[in-house]
Design a protein with these regions (language model features):
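Polar low-complexity, Ser/Thr/Gly/Ala/Asp/Asn-rich disordered segments used for subunit assembly
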Residues: 1-345, 498-499
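Loop-centered beta-sheet repeat module
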Residues: 307-392
């Protein structure tokens, strides 16, 4: 029967209805929406920072509200306006858009706990006896501060503070008192202890000398020494950040909203547990808002192993970049963007999950995540293998772009079943592909059978004669057809072999209900290629 044309109509004519988006049409490809959750610099924190006077700080507070409805963000500069420049959210947006300039991004502020901000001190002593350069390595940026002969420690510290504060995307500010340069995180709490800043003296001949926790000579009179932080490997991190924030209110504000990827700045078990519970809840059969979460860490392998195995969730990814000078929340945002769009912006060849849900993501080039400064901090092959075995996504040195990193293999934190190693859902593409199939089938079946009636399977195998009526066997045929299409697209494998497992049955208890079991075997990526090269005589 023609849609909208009553069977009782008497007026002669030809009446054709154009049906858009109905049965038989593709649901189309929707853009993947990414949500960043992290601290913003709002009015209270900005007011505190703006009380500092050596030098005077002038930070403009972000305009967003903590734990509110997420804000659409069209650019990194927009994120700076909404969340405050140099906030976690601003820096995460910079990392995301650097990899995926056209990505669809939302940001949501997790309320700053108004605790203690992490800090670090570099103290200069003795006037400069010759000109040199003070080099500052700050979150992937390199700031060179010229020092003239005769410059006092106060002059040197002042110039360094000005250089750091002028780079307003940095997550910390600088103050000086005589020759003591103090860096303080813009956001409070223990995540500030994951920040690092390195200093070097560059002589007129170009010789570089790193400033350490021992008095370090510039070779031109001035000395420098680091204090107030924590040494780890070849880096010196901020310290004393305290009072953990909570994402509980932020999670509650998106309790019914789907974002394909949620990137958290947090790395503590409490906040991660709430994120994981949210992902599991919304993926349930009555909600069907399937999502994945991504976080980052620059901690030790032992620490991230405890964290990943403690979560053990297929919808959660933990990106690990030990002793990274780029904050881990920025690393997580850029890994997320690379997973979605691939690495062409970094000169790579890999496509992302928006193009192919089963894309092989091994070796994704990250455009802005720099490698560790010291070789000793770069993970060994045994450490990379251990990370993968424990549900951790490790980053490693890029062979194509010296000084930058790649994603070794994109894995989920799900690595255990009943405390026994189990890698059935090791790759994030398994989750992405299964979600793609479920989302697409949901759309296809919903449009195909909208307003249909359900009849029992016919004994002769023929379809029902009445309009808008189907049977379990006909539904099964449609699902089987779609599974074959996914196989042709390179998303699934062995569809024919698995078809005996595809069951579609009318409920014997609830009239009008059909229950299905739909087997999906996701195509694996080519991960390892081994062989022997044998010498012949």
């Amino acid at each position: 029967m023609t849609t909208g044309l009553s069977a009782s109509r008497k007026t002669p004519g030809v009446f054709l209805a154009v049906i858009l988006g109905g049965a038989g049409t593709s649901s189309g490809v929707a853009p993947k929406r990414t949500l960043l959750q992290g601290n913003a610099i709002l009015s209270a924190r900005a007011s505190t920072l703006n009380l500092l006077t050596s030098p005077q700080i002038a930070i403009t507070a972000g305009t967003m509200t903590a734990a509110a409805t997420p804000t659409f963000c069209a650019s990194a500069d927009d994120a700076g306006s909404y969340a405050g420049r140099g906030s976690e959210l601003h820096d995460m947006a910079i990392g995301f858009f650097a990899q995926y300039p056209a990505g669809t991004l939302f940001i949501q502020a997790v309320a700053d706990a108004a605790g203690t901000a992490a800090s670090l001190v570099c103290t200069f002593a003795t006037d400069a006896s010759a000109a040199y350069t003070l080099r500052i390595y700050a979150c992937g940026q390199v700031l060179d501060v010229p020092v003239a002969s005769g410059a006092t420690p106060t002059v040197i510290a002042t110039a360094a503070a000005d250089a750091i504060n002028d780079a307003d995307t940095l997550p910390y500010i600088a103050q000086f008192s005589a020759g003591a340069l103090t860096l303080t995180a813009k956001c409070t709490g223990p995540r500030g202890n994951m920040l690092t800043c390195a200093f070097s003296f560059i002589s007129s001949a170009g010789l570089e000398t790193s400033i350490t926790t021992s008095s370090t000579s510039s070779g031109a009179g001035t000395t420098g020494i680091l204090s107030g932080g924590t040494a780890e490997g070849g880096e010196y991190f901020f310290a004393s950040g305290a009072t953990q924030d909570t994402n509980a209110d932020a999670i509650a504000a998106i309790a019914t909203t789907k974002f394909d990827r949620i990137v958290g700045s947090y790395i503590d078990s409490g906040n991660l547990g709430r994120l994981s519970a949210h992902l599991d809840s919304l993926a349930g059969v009555l909600v069907q808002k399937r999502q994945q979460g991504i976080v980052g860490s620059n901690g030790t392998l032992a620490a991230v192993t405890t964290l990943a195995t403690g979560q053990n969730k297929p919808r959660l990814q933990l990106a690990w970049h030990y002793n990274s000078r780029v904050p881990p929340w920025v690393v997580a945002a850029q890994v997320t963007a690379a997973r979605l769009i691939g690495d062409s912006v970094a000169g790579g060849l890999l496509v992302g999950e928006e193009t192919d849900p089963a894309a092989n993501l091994c070796g994704l080039e990250l455009v802005g995540v720099t490698a560790q400064n010291t070789i000793a901090d770069q993970p060994l092959s045994t450490e990379i293998e251990s990370a993968l075995n424990n549900g951790i996504t490790p980053l490693a040195l890029s062979a194509n772009r010296p000084g930058y990193t790649i994603v070794v293999r994109s894995v989920t934190t799900r690595c255990l079943a009943a405390n026994v190693p189990n890698y059935a859902v090791i790759d994030t593409t398994v989750v992405t592909s299964a979600d793609y199939v479920a989302d697409d089938l949901q759309a296809t079946l919903g449009t195909t059978y909208a307003g249909f009636k359900l009849a029992p399977n016919s004994a002769d195998g023929l379809p029902p004669r009445s309009e808008r009526t189907t049977t379990p066997d006909l539904i099964r045929a449609v699902i089987a057809r779609e599974l074959k299409l996914y196989e042709e697209q390179g998303i699934l494998i062995d569809v024919d072999a698995n078809l005996p497992l595809l069951t579609v049955e009318a409920s014997s208890v609830t009239p009008g209900r059909v229950d299905c079991v739909i087997p999906v075997e996701v195509i694996p990526g080519l991960i390892i290629l081994g062989g022997d090269v044998r010498q012949l005589s």
